[in-house]
Amino acid sequence: MAKAKFERTKPHCNIGTIGHVDHGKTSLTAAITKVLAETGGATFVDYANIDKAPEERERGITISTAHVEYETEQRHYAHVDCPGHADYVKNMITGAAQMDGGILVVSATDGPMPQTREHILLARQVGVPALVVFMNKVDLVDDAEILELVELEVRELLSSYEFPGDDIPVIKGSAVKALDGTNDEIGRNAVLELMAAVDSYIPQPERPLDKPFLMPIEDVFSISGRGTVVTGRVETGMVKVGEEVEIVGIKDTRKTTVTGVEMFRKLLDQGQAGDNIGALIRGVGREEVERGQVLAKPGSIKPHTDFSSEVYVLSKEEGGRHTPFFANYRPQFYFRTTDVTGTVELPEGTEMVMPGDNVKLGVKLIAPIAMEEGLRFSIREGGRTVGAGVVSSISK
């Protein structure tokens, strides 16, 4: 009897299957659970159960995603699979299911198709660190030369989107054979080979605690006789009493010292990733700091106004706009804890953006925000979410 609860002693990693419709992403997901179930590293989840992925709402957007978990000798994995192309786009842009790496599934009978290309581009834009390729359905191709050509095509495509196409592991196999257990060479063994590649090629993600200290400011209080307290949830890293930090965003960056940390009215000597804390800061007046700024380790993050982004625009059905928007559209961009107005620049040759579209937008904010590539944001009009995006590159 497989244990229902995994022992979380191994390092954890979030991955997902991406690729063109009907190339076998869901079959492969099922096959991985079946093969790893033999060693007690998973509970077998069949195709039908993964395919009827439940709907979730993330930032007001409806996304269908299936989650399975399994473990190898090396790691514990949370694996996400989406039923439809639109779900992938929304998932990757909102970061609803964080991906530390991806398994790109390409059918040997078709080779790379439009969504193969689109998912690779999305992975590049939203900062998925590494991909591994599973060439599926090799049982349907008799000619070994065709397999070589498909592999070459996939590698070239990956390189064209700045992934290391020559180095990425490409494993050839058949998810269906792994599921029905009829041909171990391209079935079970290929899945084991794939998981070994995922274990070794996808880098172990850095834990939030190991990153530099960052806390988005949610509220500011003044405590008579003590000074100014800023509250928020520590996103990454840790802060100790007596350490110097910077207040970044909206106004000029300034340094201060954290002279006290409290949580649930108790004084602590430090606050760390995941904690909701109040930080007492020295020499800063109540009116000199505001929601939307961040407290951060000095030099670790800079404020910016101009960036390009990958954006999903909510459809009318999702409660988004009913009409398209054009160049110089001026909505609010919601970063972490606050809205900042910004102007939008459309890609060359794009006249307008329709609700339901996925588009690359240039943005110019009226005030600088502490940001880095990969930061997620919402686009809002009068408090209503009309889009979701991720910073893909910073220009100013």
From Swiss-Prot:
Span of domain tr-type G: 10-206
Chain residues that bind GTP: 19-26, 81-85, 136-139
Cellular localisation: Cytoplasm
Gene3D superfamilies named among the record's database cross-references: P-loop containing nucleotide triphosphate hydrolases, Translation factors
Predominant location category: cytoplasm
GO molecular function, one term: GTPase activity
Renumbered residue ranges of the record's region G2: 60-64
Region (G1): 19-26
Family as reported in the entry's similarity comment: Belongs to the TRAFAC class translation factor GTPase superfamily. Classic translation factor GTPase family. EF-Tu/EF-1A subfamily.
CDD domains xref list: EF_Tu, EFTU_II, EFTU_III
Binding positions (Mg(2+)): T26
UniProt source species: Rhizorhabdus wittichii (strain DSM 6014 / CCUG 31198 / JCM 15750 / NBRC 105917 / EY 4224 / RW1)
Protein name: Elongation factor Tu
The entry's keywords: Cytoplasm, Elongation factor, GTP-binding, Hydrolase, Magnesium, Metal-binding, Nucleotide-binding, Protein biosynthesis
Description of how the protein assembles with itself and partners: Monomer.
SUPFAM superfamilies: EF-Tu/eEF-1alpha/eIF2-gamma C-terminal domain, P-loop containing nucleoside triphosphate hydrolases, Translation proteins
Cellular compartments per GO CC: cytosol
Catalytic activity, as annotated: GTP + H2O = GDP + phosphate + H(+)
Statement: the UniProt record of this protein carries the keyword Nucleotide-binding: yes
